[in-house]
Amino acid sequence: MTREATHRAIEAVWRIEAPKIIARAARVVRDVGVAEELAQDTLVAALEHWPVDGVPDNPAAWLMTAVKRRALDRVRQESLHAAKRDQLGHEMDALEAHVVPDIADALADASDDDIGDDLLRLIFTSCHPVLSTDARVALTLRLLGGLTTGEIARAFLTPEPTIAQRIVRAKRTLAAAHVPFEVPAADARPARLASVLEVIYLVFNEGHAATSGDDWTRPALCDEALRLGRVLAGLAPDESEVLGLVALMELQASRMHARTDAQGRPVLLLDQDRSRWDPLLIRRGLAALERATKLGGVRGPYALQAALAACHARARQASDTDWSQIVALYDALAEVAPSPVVELNRAVAVGMAFGPAAALELVDALRDDPALARYHWLPSVRGDLLAKLGRADEAKAEFRRAAELTRNERERELLLRRATDA
């Protein structure tokens, strides 16, 4: 194998195995920043040895063994340094008592081969609430997504130094706060899991409907969020909201190819060619939703949103959509996760089920809500309802206001076209 081919093989293996390697190192050293350094050192070792010695029969095992050794060496060094600082005034038996437990714990951690638990710990640590939302997203994509700083920066249209600083600060914050590398206890788990799901869905949403830039969608972000969601569902198969989120993302991703035309312009849901929807993703989404439902209990916001997406997925054409059922699901969603955005979406469903006049009354009641003051979908929805009611001049004004508020160029073009056509 040529050196170039070997490097390509290393890159491919690394992209798949990096999260597991970082997770295993973090299990031993209890610091995700140090763990990533050790993982990078292991990658450098592979780049040095494999072109000379050949690619191992089991590349992933080679990397895992190498990072374990480096992690244990780091723990030994730190334990010895700590012992030397404390040895003044102590006998050697006291010194040994100080050193041995740390090494024993590290050896026990390194010998535990349950990589699934390690990944789950890394997910919870990367999404810890002590971090800002932006920091959680960046750190998760770096450690668990295997994305480079440059790739994250390009995905979110953010300068690379800004992303790099976010990641560095996130690692420092986790270390300073002494955040344990562990799966949270039962009483803390719901809130911590909600933080994880929020991060994954934020990544997906930015791919599904980009908030800024020249592209309407960024499929690579959707793919990454889906991958993380599927990994999490495999590690936590009895969590209905995890399954609900996976179902929601699968169903929404199934429409990705139909959401833009050949020129990359947005195509709204009711105008989409449903033959372009991905049937495999629809089946996967419906199956995940069924598993979430079978777990019982009160349906959470992600499971309810997945049920909403399923209503669209089951409709062979737009006119087959059960809008009354969608209104009922939004009623349920408003109970468990009340927000003005949910109310706005419910108003859209009411308009489809019962007519634009009923919906406009609901939308007008939201116009003074400060949470929606800069939300471009409010004037967009209002413009659509006014157009259906024949109030063209008012509709044009609303679409123009929505165009002023959006930061996505493709969406702005769509809204201005709607203003012209109203």
Question: Which residues make up each language-model segment?
Answer:
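A short, charge-rich alpha-helical start-of-domain segment used by transcription regulators
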Residues: 1-23, 33-36, 190-198
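"A position-specific structural signal for the A-helix of alpha-solenoid helical repeats
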Residues: 245, 249-252, 305, 309, ...
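Alpha-helical junction/boundary sensor with strong preference for TPR arrays
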Residues: 229, 236, 296, 330, ...
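Amphipathic helix-loop-helix modules that constitute alpha-helical solenoid scaffolds
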Residues: 78, 86-134, 142-151, 158-331
